[in-house]
From Swiss-Prot:
It comes from Thioalkalivibrio sulfidiphilus (strain HL-EbGR7). This is Large ribosomal subunit protein uL4. Keywords: Ribonucleoprotein, Ribosomal protein, RNA-binding, rRNA-binding. The keyword Oxidoreductase does not apply. The lineage of its organism: Bacteria, Pseudomonadati, Pseudomonadota, Gammaproteobacteria, Chromatiales. Transmembrane segments: none annotated. Part of the 50S ribosomal subunit. GO terms for molecular function: rRNA binding; structural constituent of ribosome. NCBIfam families: rplD_bact (TIGR03953). Residues 43-69 are annotated as: Disordered. One of the primary rRNA binding proteins, this protein initially binds near the 5'-end of the 23S rRNA. It is important during the early stages of 50S assembly. It makes multiple contacts with different domains of the 23S rRNA in the assembled 50S subunit and ribosome.
Length: 201
């Protein structure tokens, strides 16, 4: 299949195996959920009745006081007592096989092509870290909300984009399913596209 390079108006031949797949919604959903779950801290913790201090001695004798029987001052029904079913730190990460992850990424890229949300440019560099210059370049392509994908780190591009809402910059190695589906457009350079094709082949 062929994709048009927007700034040179030339056609670029790309693999149908990577950019012409059918959309697998279930697999993409699984990849997105797994990625987001991996970002959860899972550090919350509460104290149960075995964690709170005190509670060794029986507060009063079992019978004769007229009060309800009690064995510890750290019972969950007491003030300052332990929490019932206390939260513990846990790992939320989900395992997703490499083969499934790559298939999900192929599916996402194919859908981006189908929806005309993948914008290919020959190169996308800015001479200086100026937001104004980047805005002009994006405006020339008719893009306002986009993930810019490059083949290597570009400090000027990153500094120019970091103050723009709805614009982010990523290298091919840092791509993730959430970023790809979360922007209106994915602006990708030809070298980066070749890297993606090689990675997902």
């Amino acid at each position: 299949m062929k994709l048009q390079v927007q700034d040179t108006k030339k056609d670029l031949e790309v693999s149908d195996q990577t950019f012409g797949r059918e959309f697998n919604e279930d697999l993409v959903h699984q990849a997105v959920v797994a990625y987001m779950a991996g970002g959860r801290a899972g550090t919350k913790a509460q104290k149960g009745r075995s964690d709170v201090s005190g509670g060794g001695a029986k507060p009063w004798k079992q019978k004769g006081s007229g009060r309800a029987r009690a064995g510890t001052i750290r019972s969950p029904i007491w003030r300052t007592g332990g929490k019932v079913f206390a939260a513990r730190p846990r790992d939320y990460s989900q395992k997703l096989n490499r083969k499934m992850y790559r298939a999900a990424m192929r599916s996402i890229f194919s859908e981006l092509v189908r929806q005309e949300r993948l914008v290919v440019v020959d190169s996308f560099a800015v001479d200086a870290p100026k937001t104004k210059g980047l805005l002009e370049k994006l405006g020339g392509l008719g893009v306002s909300n986009a993930l810019i994908v490059t083949d290597q780190a570009d400090a000027n591009l990153y500094l120019s984009a970091r103050n723009l809402p709805g614009v982010d910059v990523s290298e091919v190695g840092g791509l993730d399913p959430v970023s790809l589906v979360g922007f209106e457009k994915v602006l990708i350079t030809v070298p980066a596209l070749k890297q993606v094709e090689e990675w997902l082949a």
